[in-house]
Amino acid sequence: MSGSRKSLEQKIEALAALRRTADGSAAEAPLRKALADSNGFYVSKAAALVEHFGLQSLAPDLVAAFERFLDCDPIKSDPQCWAKNALIAALHTIGVRQAAPYLRGLRHVQLEPVWGGQADSAGALRGKCALALVDSELTAYQILTALTSLLVDPDKQARLDGVRAVARVAQPESALLLRLKTLTGDEHPDVMRECLLSLMTLIPAASVELVARFLDPENELRCGDAAEALASARHPEAFDALLAFLRQRIPMTVRRSALLTLAASPLPQAGEYLLTVIANEPAEAAEAAITALGASRFREEHRANAATLVKQRCTGDLTAAFDAAFAPR
């Protein structure tokens, strides 16, 4: 083992010892020194400890370290943005509302060598900065202006966190941006799912028609995401749209997926509908309804009725599904 590697491991072990033995005040001085180090991995460990202890007094040191790693050679000092990710997480956690570091991180691109070329390792950093910016000193309009670029970021994680950040701003303009993002689409299912869920949280009544457009059995994954968004909403029209879809002739795999989303519904109608499925529909759909009901907030309210319906159908598979779904928690 080289001397430099041994020295780094010793320093990291010293930080681990701080976590085990020190309170925040005793850790402040050694952590201030650690944040000034040139090794990104080591600084990432120090920043995580600052976050752990909630040391607001070290906010200037966190900012200085973040700016230093932005300005130096990233491949040598901070590969994979180890330090920068941890520094932004610490700044956000201890409540730093100064927007400057988050705005700089939002624009940072870090190309690193990979097999066959280069890849950007800063997507997650841009996403973290987006989420932190929501709690910054800026106005909602300024925040949304800065976040808009992330909705079309080349990196999937940055786009996903960008959608989440826009939704957290929770302004009418947020809904417009998310509506536009939904209409233009995204190649990654997780991003589209987040858009649909966010719209049904921000403006449920105005979003039902748009979200329901994605109830397309030809795209099972997208259809399931739309069903989940509608099912989780507190708006009766959202439930009605999902119910209308479930009454259509759709493949059983799609039907099962849509039924399972009703476990998240806050509306009493959902529990009542699941009982009708248990009573009247084919075993595969009834099993999904039993599973959904057992995971729902109406579990205890409808346990007895569901047990009676399962007993009436005299099907071993449904009995097994009921026993699994309503097993003691």
Task: Give names to the regions the model predicted.
Residues 2-23, 41-57, 73-96, 116-138, ...:
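Structural detector for internal amphipathic alpha-helices that build alpha-solenoid repeat scaffolds
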Residues 25-42, 57-76:
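Internal amphipathic alpha-helical repeat/solenoid segments
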Residues 30-32, 61-66, 101-106, 146-148, ...:
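Buried hydrophobic core positions in alpha-solenoid tandem helical repeats
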Residues 61-68, 86-93, 101-104, 128:
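Generic beta-strand or strand-like secondary-structure segments
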Residues 66-67, 107, 217-218, 279-283, ...:
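TPR/TPR-like (Sel1-like) alpha-helical repeat modules
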Residues 108-112:
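Amphipathic alpha-helical segments of tetratricopeptide repeats
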